[in-house]
């Protein structure tokens, strides 16, 4: 069985000429001399390194489509005909109390100082990619109104054209970071938070010091990695001057914009863009614990950690060291991941897939707990988009997982809402939207709820993408309530691993979740044999 065929994908705007394709190579079974394309090898003939990345940069997000032997679709959710766990104090389970709107989907995370969220979901890291920058108002206001945490990703200060550094090379003024934080905080309603992520370059630039000193942020996130790639973050730059500026700030920029040969190729328009890369991080226990102490010394109340689809060794380090450092939330992001810009073939072929990585995380967390060590609050990430995914991740990771990180899925409603506004302004709503109406009040089912939160007069300042994210978050919450009610679990802490069953023996082996014909079999036989 072939799990992923290379050499042609919509992400790289490429396609095979032939309908007959060699599964492993992705080459047409009959490659014709004279073919006009348009597979990846054809395009790489004259565009070379540009074919490494999905595109066009700044207009898309991309998600790898490798079909793994086991994934979350191999789990199904149990339903019961009696019971009601996790009801509010004093309530007895009966048909009048056990209704799905009564399900409490609020959650919280943190070692000592907790953060409450309206739903067990938060955004992926929205950093220096163009898709994050230009849609920030939609994403941030939407997350704030929805009562969930927003992660401001890496390199935001480092790529700011208006960045000012002091005499020590540290951030003195970062207007784009200021804008991002202010936008979220303006509509923050006491649930969720904004936290800023740091990588190697951010640490060197003193980003933590800046956001603590100027904005008084309570949480900072250390980034070890992500599911989409095992190298540092990337963006594309389309001017020589900008490439040289970022190189001067300490970033790795390729091809080298200071090379006269590269400059000549850029001026002749053979080279049309440059890539800005972040450095690989290096971790060790002593350094990690010391950095956590340093950040707390700056005034941060919470420190979170994001790790990617690395080998199980690194997963164990994140859990063990995170426990020692009293990390407030550990986000574990499995392959294949989604991105604003990552190497496409790396996305497809590297890393431990989500369900394998998450299953190992639970195994290791159980061992830590059995040793008497406290497990940090966990969040799972990697390929989630719907309410059933939330339930499955929370159940698989019970009792450690408190929330699920949604990357691309949380961005899409922001972009769609923005585009609805653009279409209305241009008088060209597509039928997929106009079937519901021609004004925001008609189109957005949650318009009045958002207006109730911020006030009618303030709605003129609310971007439609934010209303879109609020609507999507509502769909997730209500859908999760229904699934939880069917499983007779009326609060997030009440969800257990028993609420899942494996549809295949291989899934049962990977996850430790019983095969469908074994789940609850003992209880069933006790009834039959009674």
Language-model features: where?
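Active-site beta-loop-alpha junctions enriched in small/polar residues
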Residues: 126-128, 155-157, 197-203, 225-227, ...
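Conserved, well-structured core domains of diverse proteins
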Residues: 1-119, 131-144, 149, 161-192, ...
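Hydrophobic faces of well-ordered beta-strands that scaffold small-molecule active sites
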Residues: 119-124, 148-154, 192-198, 218-224, ...
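Glycine-rich phosphate/ribose-binding loops and adjacent secondary-structure elements
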Residues: 266-451
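Conserved, mostly hydrophobic/aromatic
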Residues: 123, 143, 330, 393, ...
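Gly/Ser/Thr/Ala-enriched C-terminal appendages of enzymes
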Residues: 370-371, 385-521, 525-530
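Phosphate/diphosphate-binding loops
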Residues: 189-213, 359, 363, 433-436
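Active-site beta->alpha loop and helix N-cap motifs at the rims of alpha/beta catalytic domains
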Residues: 193-203, 224-228, 271, 278-285
């Amino acid at each position: 069985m072939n799990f992923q065929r290379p050499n042609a994908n919509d992400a790289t705007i490429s396609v095979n000429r032939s309908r007959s394709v060699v599964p492993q190579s992705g080459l047409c079974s009959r490659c014709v001399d004279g073919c006009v394309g348009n597979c990846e090898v054809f395009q790489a003939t004259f565009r070379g390194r540009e074919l490494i990345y999905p595109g066009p940069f700044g207009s898309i997000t991309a998600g790898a489509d490798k079909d793994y032997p086991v994934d979350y679709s191999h789990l199904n959710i149990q339903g019961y005909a009696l019971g009601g766990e996790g009801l509010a104090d004093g309530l007895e389970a009966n048909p009048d109390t056990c209704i799905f709107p009564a399900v409490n989907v609020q959650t919280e995370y943190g070692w000592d100082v907790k953060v409450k969220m309206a739903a067990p979901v938060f955004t992926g890291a929205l950093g220096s990619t163009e898709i994050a920058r230009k849609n920030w108002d939609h994403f941030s206001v939407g997350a704030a109104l929805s009562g969930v945490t927003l992660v401001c990703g890496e390199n935001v200060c480092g790529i700011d054209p208006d960045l000012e550094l002091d005499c020590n090379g540290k951030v003195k003024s970062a207007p784009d970071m200021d804008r991002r934080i202010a936008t979220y905080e303006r509509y923050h309603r006491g649930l969720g938070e904004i936290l800023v992520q740091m990588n190697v370059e951010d640490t060197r630039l003193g980003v933590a010091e800046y956001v603590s000193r100027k904005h008084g942020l309570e949480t900072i996130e250390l980034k070890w990695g992500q599911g989409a790639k095992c190298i540092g973050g990337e963006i594309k730059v389309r001017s020589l001057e900008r490439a040289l500026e970022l190189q001067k700030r300490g970033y790795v920029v390729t091809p080298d914009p200071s090379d006269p040969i590269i400059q000549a190729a850029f001026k002749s328009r053979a080279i049309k863009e440059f890539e800005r890369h972040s450095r690989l991080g290096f971790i060790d226990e002593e350094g990690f614990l010391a950095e956590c102490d340093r950040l707390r010394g700056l005034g941060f109340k919470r420190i979170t950690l994001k790790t990617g689809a690395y080998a199980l060794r690194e997963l164990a380090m994140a859990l063990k060291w995170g426990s020692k450092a009293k990390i407030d939330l550990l986000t574990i992001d499995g392959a294949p991941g989604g991105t604003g810009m990552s190497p496409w073939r790396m996305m497809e072929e590297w890393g431990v897939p989500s369900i394998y990585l998450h299953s190992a995380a639970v195994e290791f967390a159980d061992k830590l707990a059995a040793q008497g060590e406290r497990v940090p609050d966990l969040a799972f990430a990697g390929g989630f988009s719907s309410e059933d995914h939330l339930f499955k991740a929370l159940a698989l990771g019970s009792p450690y997982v408190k929330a699920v990180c949604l990357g691309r899925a949380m961005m899409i409603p922001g972009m769609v809402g923005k585009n609805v506004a653009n279409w209305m302004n241009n008088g060209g709503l597509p039928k997929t939207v106009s079937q519901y109406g021609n004004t925001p009040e008609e189109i957005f089912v949650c318009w009045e709820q958002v207006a109730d939160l911020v006030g009618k007069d303030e709605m003129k300042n609310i971007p439609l993408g934010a209303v879109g994210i609020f609507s999507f978050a509502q769909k997730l919450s209500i859908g999760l309530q229904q699934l939880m009610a069917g499983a007779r679990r009326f609060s997030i802490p009440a969800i257990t691993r028993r609420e899942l069953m494996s549809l295949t023996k291989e899934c049962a082996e990977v996850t430790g979740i019983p095969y469908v014909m074994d789940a609850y079999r003992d209880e069933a036989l006790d009834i039959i044999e009674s």
